[in-house]
Structures are given as structure tokens and as C-alpha cells.
Amino acid sequence: MTTPNANLQNSAPLPAERPTPLPRLLLSALLAAVLFMLVCGLAYPLLTTVVAGAAFPNQAGGSLVTRNGQVVGSAVLGQNFTAPRYLHGRPSMTSKTDGSGPEPYNAENSGASNWGPTNAKLQGAVQGRIAAFRQENGLGADVPVPIDAVTASASGLDPDVTLATALLQVNRIAQARGMQPAGVEKVIRAHLKGRDLGLLGEPRVNVLAVNLSLDGQ
């Protein structure tokens, strides 16, 4: 009778495992890279584009707004309204595409100032905007100015303002258009959107939608 140790001693040694040739490793890596590029760079974007176009055609196309057959803007991108007869949006810190100077609501160069809350430039800019907002809307020094009226969004392209900011502009818009303030306020409230999911954000109005409605009065 043989013992286990004897069997181990009499067994032939296992052959040494041969390393995978380098060309084969490179070929495997290349094939994996090509596969992931096709899946992640072609198949997945095409699939999401087709699904989004079928399920959400308006949003997938940019949420474009038309008037008399002409595209006048997008519901999700703000515009730089400055005339007294229009509702004004938030400040925008976007610049020209070549960086040569400011260009509010430039969708080709979205971004913010990147100034921190303690930065003297930001504090000075906000104080200047508060004074300008009060002056253009005929507000007294004791009237609180909503924060969204004097601060830019992270994208510089925010299409909405809070209801409070919109209502503070009613008298200026009404005077410029020869309307009653109640009529302007009615248009603004007709475009009021509530908080997202009933919890997030503030009640807001879309600036472009309000201005188009005002032009249609």
C-alpha cells in the first residue's frame, strides 16, 4: 500500500505555464478598446437619441419656441431682455466666445464668474445690481430685492425668474406698454410654475413665455 506522500513524490512535475505573448495581449487590448468605443461612443448615443426623440420630441429638439412659424428662442435658455417693456431675467456673466468681453446669455460660452461669496468683486457687483434694479423699477430703499434678481446662475442661461422678482417689475412694464399693472400681473401669474416635485426651488415664471404673451396683448 502506497502512502499519499509516496504518490506525490512519484508524480511527474507540472509543466510551467507559458506567458501570453505580447502581441496577443496588445491585440486583446485593442479589440476591447474598439468594442467599448463602438458601444459607448456610437451605439449608446444613437439609442438614447432615438428613444429621446420618440418619447420627448420637443425636449430632444431643444424645447424651441416658435411664433408665426419662426423660432424665437428656447424654453430652457434665457435671453438678454433689456427694454423697459419686457420682463427682465437674471444677470448673466457669460462672455463672448473669444473671451474678448462680456456677452450676457451667450449659449456658446456658458458659465459663471467663479467669484467666491467673500470676493470683493462679487460683493460690489451685487450691490451695483441691487441699486440698478431698484432704480429701473422705481423701488424704494426699503423694498427687499430677491436674490435671483441680482445674482447670476451657474450657467448664465437661466430662463426663469422667481415670482417675487417678476412682480417687482410689473409697474415698469405696465408704464412702458401703457397697460394697467393688474393686466401685466395677470399675464405673469398665468405662466407661474410651482416648485419641482412640490418641494424643490421656488415658484417661478419663464421670462420668454411672459414676454411673448405681453407682445400678444
From Swiss-Prot:
The chain crosses the membrane at residues 25-45. It is found in: Cell membrane. The keyword Metal-binding does not apply. The system is composed of three essential subunits: KdpA, KdpB and KdpC. Residues 87-117 are annotated as: Disordered. GO terms for cellular component: plasma membrane. It comes from Deinococcus radiodurans (strain ATCC 13939 / DSM 20539 / JCM 16871 / CCUG 27074 / LMG 4051 / NBRC 15346 / NCIMB 9279 / VKM B-1422 / R1). It holds the Pfam family KdpC. One of its GO terms (biological process) is potassium ion transmembrane transport. Residues 107-117 have a biased composition (Polar residues). Belongs to the KdpC family. This is Potassium-transporting ATPase KdpC subunit. Part of the high-affinity ATP-driven potassium transport (or Kdp) system, which catalyzes the hydrolysis of ATP coupled with the electrogenic transport of potassium into the cytoplasm. This subunit acts as a catalytic chaperone that increases the ATP-binding affinity of the ATP-hydrolyzing subunit KdpB by the formation of a transient KdpB/KdpC/ATP ternary complex. One of its GO terms (molecular function) is ATP binding. It is a single-pass membrane protein. Keywords: ATP-binding, Cell membrane, Ion transport, Membrane, Nucleotide-binding, Plasmid, Potassium, Potassium transport, Transmembrane, Transmembrane helix, Transport.
